[in-house]
C-alpha cells in the first residue's frame, strides 16, 4: 500500500503517446480525433457491479501493481490517462461491466513485471484512433455517460465509431481537488 501511495504522489508520470489528427466542435462540445499508440497494458475486468463500484474495486489493484506489487517489486511510475472501457446498453445506461486499461510505461514495455494479483492481466493492444472530449471535476459513471451522449450527438453522421463500448479516462490522482481532467473516447470504426 505504501508503494502505491509513494508511486502515485512522487513517481514519474508519462503520457500515453498519441497524435492529434484533427479538432472539431459542435455547439458547446469540443473534440479531437487522435491516433493513440498501442502497446502492453495491465488490465483488470470487473463484472456484475455498477461502474462506479467496479472502478473502486479495480483501480487499487492496478495502482498496487504499478506501485511495486509485482514479481520484480518495482514501482514503475504512472502513465496517464488511465482508461476504462464501459459497455452501454441499448437505452444508454451502462452495463455492470468494466475493464481498466493501464498503459505500461515505455521503460517496461519490452519486459513488464508480472502482476502478483492473478486478476491483473498483461495484454498487447494495437493502436487505436479515437474521438475525444474533455471535462473536469470528480467524474462518476453518470458524468461519463452524459459526456459520451454529447460527443455522439456532436459527431452525428460525420464519423463512424464503435457503439458497443467506449473509454472513460482520468489523468489525475484522487487527491487533486481542482483542475481535474477527464475524457470520453469513442473508438473510430473502420467500417
From Swiss-Prot:
Which InterPro entries does the record match to this protein?
Reg_factor_effector_dom_sf, SOUL_haem-bd
Record's GO cellular component terms: cytoplasm
Keyword Repressor recorded: no
Key word Isomerase present:
no
Q: Which GO terms describe its molecular function?
A: heme binding
Annotated localization: Cytoplasm
| Pfam families hit by this protein | SOUL
Name the keywords, alphabetized. Answer: Cytoplasm
PANTHER family per the UniProt record, alphabetical: HEME-BINDING PROTEIN 1, HEME-BINDING PROTEIN-RELATED
Q: What does this protein do?
A: May bind free porphyrinogens that may be present in the cell and thus facilitate removal of these potentially toxic compound. Binds with a high affinity to one molecule of heme or porphyrins. It binds metalloporphyrins, free porphyrins and N-methylprotoporphyrin with similar affinities.
Self-association state and partner proteins as the record states? Monomer.
User: What family is this?
Assistant: Belongs to the HEBP family.
Q: What is known of its domains?
A: Forms a distorted beta-barrel structure, with two helices that are packed against the outer surface of the barrel. Porphyrins are expected to bind to a hydrophobic patch on the outer surface of the beta-barrel structure.
Protein name according to UniProt? Heme-binding protein 1
